Amino acid sequence: MSNLSRRNFITGGAIAALGGTLAIAGCAPKGESSSTVAGAAGEGAQAWTGTANGKGGELTVEVITEGDSIARINPLKSRESYGVGTAGIDVLSDLIVKNQTLNVDMVTGATVSSMAFLTAVSDAVDASGMKSSEWKKREKAVPQAPEGLTTDVDVVVVGAGGAGYAAALTAAEAGKNVVLLEKLGIVGGDTILSGGAMAVPNNWFQKRDGIEDSVEKMAEDMIVGGDHVGDPDLVNVICEGAYGAMEWLIFNGGVAWQPYERFFGGHSVIRSLIPEGNEGSGIICKLDKRAEGLKNLKVCRNTKADELVQDASGAVVGLKATNTATGETYDFKAKAVILAAGGFGSNVEMRMKYNPEMDEKILSTDSVGATGDCHVMAEKIGANLIDMQYIQTYPTCDTQTGALLYVGNMRLENRAICINKEGDRFVEEMERRDVISNAIKEQTDGIGYMIFNQDGLDHTDIATVNAAEMDGLFGRGQLAKGETIAEACEPFGIDAAELQKTVEKWNGYCKDGADPDFNYRAALNPIEGGPYYILAYKPSVHYTMGGLHINTDAQVLDSDAAPIPGLFAAGEQAGHKMGTNRLGSCSITDVFVFGRVAGANAAALA
């Protein structure tokens, strides 16, 4: 572990427009140019607008033209996800302007946002009098590898998610030459798609609020929450390293945290920090910026790991990879390789190989890149896979897309109760994820609902931070609002009379300070007075507990439990830490603790 210095602290300023509309001036009507753009481009520049539907809703762009060329592209209105959709848009905008072409591929990992952006830009180009169809026939532009990339390095890291960035930055901070490979066109993995919550025992908010906690208590929660299947030694590394990893994120990464914590199911006390912006992008985007400032670290997007290279003794001494955008192949030589490419939740075939119940009927919250490529790659050289049958579902996900519902965090804010179509509660809302998921499967249509009211919503920042998600859910009939409980029930066909009784009973429990039905373990907050909201949800595959077997030094083990020299793994890539089930917010702790462990130990070999 490197020494931490407050001189290295980078303040975490507010991240603008997270999940919301970019507050830029309104746009001109379609097909109508603005007046000459003063001071923004060359003489005679004009602005044209185009609109399309993105993943977050309406996307409007302004294209600045100078004669027959595109000088600049500005998003006027966008609710695309920060660090994901916005990253894809940035890539395409740069390619289009630099190469004067619309012949570009969609950015993998941000496909929907990319398609919408290209459609909107094409719309604006047509409005200018030029023909987008002709621009799309021009020479194709593709993202290029980082300038100065060399294949002779000290450490290769595969997967630019939380664990990958932690490993790569730690090794680079130790003075080693590092390359970080990401097969998608954007970085972040599942970390950037998550809420970014991080379980940290003995943190300053607990001390402020008089909450007693300890490393041992968190470790016990994780072991019990995973039904005593996880390796206690690995769990202890996570819990003991949590506070240091949190400090590293602040002082070395510039990550800022909200001034409150969140209670996740299965934990015995509240201990989970929330990043500024309430999303994993509040962490990943800061780490990516930190990486950009290091000359000895190169981040290679669109670069897929193909094969591990070993010497005569069996030690891993490099890796073969392919740039999927350019077709260029690389033969990296390194003293160590760190695999941090996440799980396999998006690979249905692989899921069913280890757990036949996890078939295509169950959607996934995971990144499209979570396909288990590196599990297979490492297994080919003798690495041991462990706990692969344990696959977690997240209980409150979109019934149509499978995406994790952040509006569903009303449950974690202790402001909602879980009900079924019959209007009854069916589970303790703060239970383990697997317990809630299994309970939902037993309900009518395999769907659960949660009810909350305006007062509860106003006690959180959920409506503000997740405005785009709420609008989308209303539009697709997955979220309903009514002045009365009966009005909110109507779109879903929920038994309103029974739900009225359930809410009244709940409010009584809140006054009494106890829940005799399900022994609710968090703060009891009543749901009194409208307007009322009801959200539909069902479980989606969220996390794969199994992966490469590692030891406490993050070394990958073979079938005889012996370390494979030169090979490390971290994050969801590595198994046998969580057991049968993972407690919420422990994954973020894991990726940054073991990412740093892997990075430090890999650097020690170089």
UniProtKB/Swiss-Prot annotation:
Cofactor (UniProt): FAD; FMN
FMN phosphoryl threonine: residues bearing it: 111
E.C. numbers: 1.3.99.33
Keywords, comma-separated and alphabetical: FAD, Flavoprotein, FMN, Oxidoreductase, Phosphoprotein, Signal
Molecular function GO terms recorded: FMN binding; steroid dehydrogenase activity, acting on the CH-CH group of donors
Modified how: Predicted to be exported by the Tat system. The position of the signal peptide cleavage has not been experimentally proven.
Cofactor binding note from Swiss-Prot or TrEMBL: Binds 1 FAD per subunit.
Tree of life domain: Bacteria
GO cellular component: membrane
Binding site residues for FAD: 163, 182, 191, 195-197, 305, 373, 572, 588
Disulfide bond annotation, renumbered to this chain: none
InterPro entries (alphabetical): FAD-dep_OxRdtase_2_FAD-bd, FAD-oxidoreductase_2, FAD/NAD-bd_sf, Flavocytochrome_c, FMN-bd, Succ_DH/fumarate_Rdtase_cat_sf, TAT_signal
Catalytic activity: dihydrourocanate + A = urocanate + AH2
Family membership noted in the UniProt record: Belongs to the FAD-dependent oxidoreductase 2 family. FRD/SDH subfamily.
Role noted for this protein: Catalyzes the two-electron reduction of urocanate to dihydrourocanate (also named imidazole propionate or deamino-histidine). Dihydrourocanate is present at higher concentrations in subjects with type 2 diabetes, and directly impairs glucose tolerance and insulin signaling at the level of insulin receptor substrate (IRS) through activation of p38 gamma (MAPK12)-p62-mTORC1. Therefore, the UrdA enzyme from the gut bacteria E.lenta strain DSM 2243 may contribute to the pathogenesis of type 2 diabetes by producing the microbial metabolite dihydrourocanate.
Note: E.lenta strain DSM 2243 is significantly more abundant in subjects with type 2 diabetes (T2D) compared with subjects with normal glucose tolerance (NGT).
Protein name: Urocanate reductase
Lineage: Bacteria, Bacillati, Actinomycetota, Coriobacteriia, Eggerthellales
